[in-house]
Swiss-Prot record:
One of the essential components for the initiation of protein synthesis. Stabilizes the binding of IF-2 and IF-3 on the 30S subunit to which N-formylmethionyl-tRNA(fMet) subsequently binds. Helps modulate mRNA selection, yielding the 30S pre-initiation complex (PIC). Upon addition of the 50S ribosomal subunit IF-1, IF-2 and IF-3 are released leaving the mature 70S translation initiation complex. The gene is infA. Residues 1-73 form the S1-like domain. This is Translation initiation factor IF-1. GO terms for molecular function: ribosome binding; rRNA binding; translation initiation factor activity.
Amino acid sequence: MAKKDGVIEIEGVVTEALPNAMFRVELTNKHIVLAHISGKMRQHYIRILPEDRVVVELSPYDLTRGRIVYRYK
């Protein structure tokens, strides 16, 4: 997995599945963010369900939206 500069990676738990591969994720610091699946996860048909533990990448510009980059087994 390539590391990007300037992004914040944080763990969270998926609380709700929304349309168009969007998810509501509660982060470990109790914030709620709206996240979508990264392209590689979509390409490899990795399914995400509520209650899954995931890693979310946040941009420093908008901390309310993110990208799910990893799902724990």
